[in-house]
Amino acid sequence: DRIAVTRICEVLELKAQVAAAVWPGFDDPQFEVPLVYFTDSLCYAVNPEARFLAQYPATLRYRDGELKIYTTPTIDSLEFHMQGTISLDPADAGSAYDYRSAYLLCSSPEITARCIPGTEEVAIWRTMVLHEYFHGFQFRHPAYLAQFEASGAGLIPSSELVGHYQRYGWYKESVDRENAFLLDALRQTDAEIIRRDIDGFRKLRAERHARMRRELAPEAVGAERVYETMEGTARYIEFHACPGGYDLDANDWLYRTDISQYMYATGFNIVRLLDKLGVDYKTRLFDEGLALDGL
């Protein structure tokens, strides 16, 4: 119990630090996301809600003020967990502990290291957990949840958009050029050049989105905007959660569209550009259910 509780508390402390330094409100109690931490033998549930406690036999193991950590038998048989979870299916209203209520599921550092090469350092594991924690934070905002449901993202998985990127030359060429405009704007210091880069990005994106609506699916555009906002901001949190920060030159997967799922990279770059331009977006993005490329 001691090791698991210590690691959970370290994650919560890091979350508070990132909230203070990078994203105000991330640790606000009204957006609290219950955490389920998996070991090889049991689960630790951090501030679970009543539906979870009614569904699984739980024993209170640790309490410190408002923080309560319970243990339960392992709640599923999956080998690895590192994701936010929320059910939006009305059929789950009476049965799912996460019905319209985001949770974070994460495996212990030991399980994570076994399943994901390159994650042996606990510090790297913490950045992964913070990334997923931020997804729960997003879905705890009613306006963002409404935007997600209205966008078509629930019908079109991000893998389908990545498939379009890999399959259609016009799609990939435009996405890569859009990202090149963002990266150039991040490098430049001349305001006029930055403005031209932003205009170039918007023109290319508008043309691609129009073609997506004609040739693919109208819902694909809304889904892309939601995933870009969701994953770009979570990658931004992960970036800032890394001790000392990631070396961008050595970690080009963070910002290149041809290495990771492209929405992660473009979203991450838009967030960094908004920071550079001094745009007040963090207090509005999820409260108002906005998309990054509309700011």
Protein language model regions, located:
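A general structural signal for short secondary-structure junctions and capping/turn motifs
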Residues: 25-28, 93-96, 118-119, 129, ...
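Mature extracytoplasmic/lumenal regions of exported proteins
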Residues: 122-123, 137, 144
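Post-HExxH zinc-binding segment in Zn-dependent metallohydrolases
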Residues: 140-216, 220, 224-246, 267
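N-terminal mature-domain "stem" immediately C-terminal to a signal peptide or N-terminal signal-anchor/transmembrane
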Residues: 1-74, 123, 127, 234
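Pan-zinc metallopeptidase signature
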Residues: 2-21, 203-295
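Short, well-ordered loop/turn and helix-capping segments at boundaries between secondary-structure elements
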Residues: 139, 143, 276-279
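Active-site scaffold of zinc-dependent metalloenzymes
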Residues: 60-122
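Active-site recognition of the HExxH zinc-binding catalytic motif
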Residues: 127-140
